[in-house]
């Protein structure tokens, strides 16, 4: 997407990544994490944050040398060339943005309608989903600087609300609630949950997907990635300590989808419940804003470089590309037609596979981009283990989703094979910006 010439600053890039990472997950699956990890939830967030930092090591080394809005696909293409695997991964990357938009739209409707005491029915949900996607799509008409400024404000409000939650919660904490449980079953639950919550750190990739629009990307892309992960890790751990330190685990599990809002009541009362609900709306909004921006950039870059159909790169209204409108429209369609829980799990597995190929690409290109081989090998082993844990979890909890993952990979491969045969298009060698 050819946006205006103004570049994103370091902190605007950080705010975009934080906006995606502290998205719906901290609010919607917090109760699930409490059920699996118990009072080891803060340690779970630390462990999953370490996984993210390992992946980020490869992202920063590659992102400093390979500047492209195609993000991880540019890294993989540089390492293994133009082939069916690269093409399939590029389609999976773009689809992950589409489905994420749908998830955020559904999550926003779920919080917004009760907050304004509106009837929760199919019509109101649909109108809300369409409206919120349309709003942030319109915001993206005005280019990366408008997106960055809006994201900075949204993330600031969200962090202030979560900061109040953390500060107030720490004052009234029950120390016995947060003592780590070292029983073997509890430790295994913590490791298992870390594979789930690793997904809560996935948003840092939006930085590399917008690297062409970031000031001094060689310096700021690595900085933005590490800063954003560390900020998010601090917030996650603080929220977890405040939540489990004020509410017994059993009550957190019962609260399920609004666990944080319920956890705020003991020390902030009804005002806390309201603030956390508003924080959830800001959180989901910022995640959607950054995801629409990142998804449109990926669609444009991949079309320009030969992997998606040419109409994705055509400019239409307001000098934006059709890729922006198609990405948003498909996101709305998924939100209106499908239950997104299973699809979200499939998307998470897709990101894991992309991360594995990014680390592999770093190993192949290590002489060119720099880095230590032992760290790269260790990262690959760890992320592969996390991926297998995720698959195992889905196998024992939702067999349909497990088969859906396999079907997704096979389906995309078949599409890629047919697409290349019919169109004869290949990746362009001009997808990279020399840094």
Curated annotation (Swiss-Prot):
Topology with respect to the bilayer: Multi-pass membrane protein
Membrane-spanning residues: 14-34, 44-64, 84-104, 123-143, 153-173, 187-207, 224-244, 267-287, 324-344, 346-366, 375-395, 400-420
Keyword Transcription: no
Family matches, as InterPro entries: AA/rel_permease1 (IPR002293), APC_superfamily (IPR050367)
Subcellular location: Cell membrane
Coiled-coil region list: none
GO terms assigned for molecular function: transmembrane transporter activity
Protein name: Uncharacterized protein MJ0609
Protein's organism: Methanocaldococcus jannaschii (strain ATCC 43067 / DSM 2661 / JAL-1 / JCM 10045 / NBRC 100440) (Methanococcus jannaschii)
Organism classification: Archaea, Methanobacteriati, Methanobacteriota, Methanomada group, Methanococci
